[in-house]
Every structure is written in structure tokens, then in C-alpha cells.
């Protein structure tokens, strides 16, 4: 009996069906070690269909060992057949790939949990608000602050800084250190401290008369500084005067005074500008001599000095005089400031040479010997 064409004696061969568009192929590790060829083995395969990503290490090792065995090389010290039989089994490769997947997943989970924990910690820090105490508490605490600790106290918080701007704070500080036997100028006496204008500057000046730690600082200044002061560079000369000093010497000495105002550095942004006190305390913080200092040079004889008021002080040197017994001071003034790295020739600018020099002193605006106006 003849059979029809649809009934074959042998089994039908397996047919490979192409996947639909958009469905990803499963790339199994044992496929690389078998004789089956898939679309993923070709370089021009569709990336939308073929699974993207790197080849797992277990699959790469199996392929490498099979290639070595086909080329007649040994994958390791064991024969190629043993290597293929031991490593090429699908179950072992799947187990190793599963272990690597588990390790990768655990690593990702740890990194994600660490990021969440750091983010939660940052949110806790941002949301943590401290206690805000009233202004009276800070004013009470300020009564126990030493004069040298005022800056540290004002940096605690904004309310503490605001307290240091008030007239009550500076008045209490003055009364706490005032003594009846204190030798003070007329402007720094108690009857003159009732004025609010320049109150802060006057209290600071009085502390250098009454407060022992501050008075000890200025008493250690030598007649000739050990090193040339560098803080006066690019300062503007506001005033100049000289006076005759009659002392124990047979011949009088001459005192030359230069009043300078230090130039504030250029600020790149307005956020870096100096912190201004509240408007109601502007008079308390007013100081006409802010950033000013006085250079006082005493010579053994009179020396003619050119007009330097309004000019910029650029160079200051102190050397040994020609007689090897005194000092020689050289001052150089320019019409404009000297920027960093700019070198000037020796003949440029207006030069003032004082020789022989008896003493050189530099007084800041709070120094007791600094001449300040009684109207301040």
C-alpha cells in the first residue's frame, strides 16, 4: 500500500523559526559550546532582536577552551578532552553564570542601599534645625565674654553677632573694665562715652589703656622693627606733617609722620563684601580712621621732604646707615598702585630718604599714640 506524501517514514527535521520583531533571543551559555548557530553569533544582527550587553565570563572561558582544543593546544595542564568534558557541561556553566548574576545583583543592591542611606543622612542633616534663643539670652552671655574672645563669640550665630553690634554691648564692656585711676584722653572718659557715634572705636581704644593683655601687646614693640613692615604696600598717603622734638639731647630731633589708609582688596563678587551692621547701629560702628595707620620716623636732623599726599606708597626699606651706627629709611611713592608681580625701576616714582634714623614706629588706629580727632 502506497503512502501519501504527507506520511514519511523518518522523523521530520527540526525547523528553526525566526523570532518576531521586538522579541529578544535568550543567549544561553551552553549554546556557545554546542554546534548550534544562532542569529546572535553574527556581527550584523539586529540590536533590537539580539540581546545587548557583554558576554559573561563563564561563556567566554568555555569558548576559549573549546577553541584551544580544536587548534591542538592545551587549555591548561589537563588534556583538552578532560577540559571540555569538565567545563563544557551546560549545568556547570549555568551554575557559574547564575553565581555571577547573583554576585552582580548583590553588588548593585549594596550600592543602591548605600546611596539611599547617604541621601537619607543628607536629608536628616538639612532638616535638623537647632534651637533659636532670644536676643536677651545672648546679651546676658555677652556680659561674661573677654575682649579678646568677642570675635569668636560673634561667630556662633547671627543673633550673637547682632548682640555685638548693639550700643548696650559696648557700653557694658567699657564699664566692666573702667577704673577710676585709669589715665584716659578726654574723648575716652565716661562722660564722653554717652555719645553713640564712634562708640565701638572709642571703647576699643580705651581697652588699650585699661585692659592689661592689650596694653602688654603694644609695650613690646621695639624702636626699630625686626623686619620691614609689608602691610603698607599700595596704601594711600592721606596726611603728612613733621614736628620738632626737644629732649635730653643737645640737638633736637625731628619726627616725620605719614598717615596712610590701606586699600581694601578688589572683591570678585558682592557676596564677599564686608558684613554690615544693622541700620539702627550704624552710628555705633562709625569709624573715620578705619583701615588707617600712622608711620612715624624720627631722625637726628631735619630733612626736606617732597609733597607725597595723595600718592600711593609702593616701597619701604630699612637699611644700615653709612656711618654703621644708625639706620636709613627709603620710601617710594607712585601715582597708581603696583599690581602683583610688577617690578619698577629704582628711578621711578617719588623717593624719600631719611638718614640717619633714630626710630621707626607703625601705629594702627587703636594704638594709644595714634592721633585721633576729638570730634570722632
UniProtKB/Swiss-Prot annotation:
| Transmembrane residue ranges | 300-320
Q: Which membrane topology describes this protein?
A: Single-pass membrane protein
UniProt keyword Transmembrane helix present: yes
Where does this protein reside within or beyond the cell?
Answer: Membrane
Keywords on record: Membrane, Transmembrane, Transmembrane helix
Compositionally biased residues, Acidic residues: 95-106
GO CC field: membrane; SCF ubiquitin ligase complex
Positions of the UniProt region annotated as Disordered: 1-21, 81-127
InterPro entries this protein is in?
F-box-like_dom_sf, TMEM183
- Would you identify the family this protein belongs to, as annotated? Belongs to the TMEM183 family.
Give the protein name, as stated in the record: Transmembrane protein 183
Annotated organism of origin: Rattus norvegicus
Q: What is the lineage of its organism?
A: Eukaryota, Metazoa, Chordata, Craniata, Vertebrata
Amino acid at each position: 500500500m502506497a503512502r501519501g506524501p504527507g506520511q514519511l517514514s523518518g522523523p521530520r527535521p527540526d525547523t528553526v523559526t525566526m523570532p518576531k520583531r521586538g522579541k529578544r533571543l535568550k543567549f544561553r551559555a551552553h549554546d556557545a559550546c554546542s554546534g548550534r548557530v544562532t542569529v546572535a553569533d553574527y556581527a550584523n544582527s539586529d540590536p533590537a532582536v539580539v540581546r545587548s550587553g557583554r558576554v559573561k565570563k563563564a561563556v567566554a572561558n568555555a569558548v576559549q577552551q573549546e577553541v584551544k582544543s580544536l587548534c591542538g593546544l592545551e587549555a591548561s595542564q589537563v588534556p583538552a578532552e578532560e577540559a571540555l568534558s569538565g567545563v563544557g557541561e551546560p549545568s556547570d556553566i549555568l551554575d557559574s553564570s547564575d553565581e555571577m548574576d547573583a554576585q552582580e545583583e548583590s553588588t548593585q543592591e549594596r550600592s543602591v542601599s548605600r546611596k539611599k542611606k547617604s541621601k537619607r543622612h543628607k536629608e536628616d542633616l538639612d532638616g535638623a534645625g537647632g534651637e533659636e534663643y532670644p536676643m536677651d539670652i545672648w546679651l546676658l552671655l555677652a556680659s561674661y565674654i573677654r575682649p579678646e574672645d568677642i570675635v569668636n563669640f560673634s561667630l556662633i550665630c547671627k543673633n550673637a553677632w547682632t548682640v555685638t553690634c548693639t550700643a548696650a554691648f559696648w557700653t557694658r564692656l567699657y564699664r566692666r573694665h573702667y577704673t577710676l585711676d585709669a589715665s584716659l584722653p578726654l574723648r575716652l572718659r565716661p562722660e564722653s562715652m554717652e555719645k553713640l557715634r564712634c562708640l565701638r572705636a572709642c571703647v576699643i581704644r580705651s581697652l588699650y589703656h585699661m585692659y592689661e593683655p592689650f596694653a602688654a601687646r603694644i609695650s613690646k614693640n621695639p624702636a626699630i622693627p625686626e623686619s620691614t613692615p609689608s602691610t603698607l604696600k599700595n596704601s594711600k598717603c592721606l596726611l603728612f606733617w613733621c614736628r620738632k622734638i626737644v629732649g635730653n639731647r643737645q640737638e633736637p630731633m625731628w619726627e616725620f609722620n605719614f598717615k596712610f589708609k590701606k586699600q581694601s582688596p578688589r572683591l570678585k563678587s558682592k557676596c564677599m563684601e564686608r558684613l554690615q551692621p544693622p541700620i539702627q547701629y550704624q552710628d555705633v560702628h562709625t569709624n573715620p580712621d578705619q583701615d588707617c595707620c600712622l608711620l612715624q620716623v624720627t631722625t637726628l636732623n631735619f630733612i626736606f621732604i617732597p609733597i607725597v599726599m595723595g600718592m600711593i606708597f609702593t616701597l619701604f626699606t630699612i637699611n644700615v646707615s653709612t656711618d654703621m651706627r644708625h639706620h636709613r629709611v627709603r620710601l617710594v611713592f607712585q601715582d597708581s598702585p603696583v599690581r602683583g608681580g610688577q617690578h619698577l625701576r629704582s628711578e621711578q616714582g617719588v623717593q624719600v630718604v631719611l638718614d640717619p634714623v633714630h626710630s621707626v614706629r607703625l601705629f594702627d588706629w587703636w594704638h594709644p599714640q595714634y592721633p585721633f580727632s576729638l570730634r570722632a
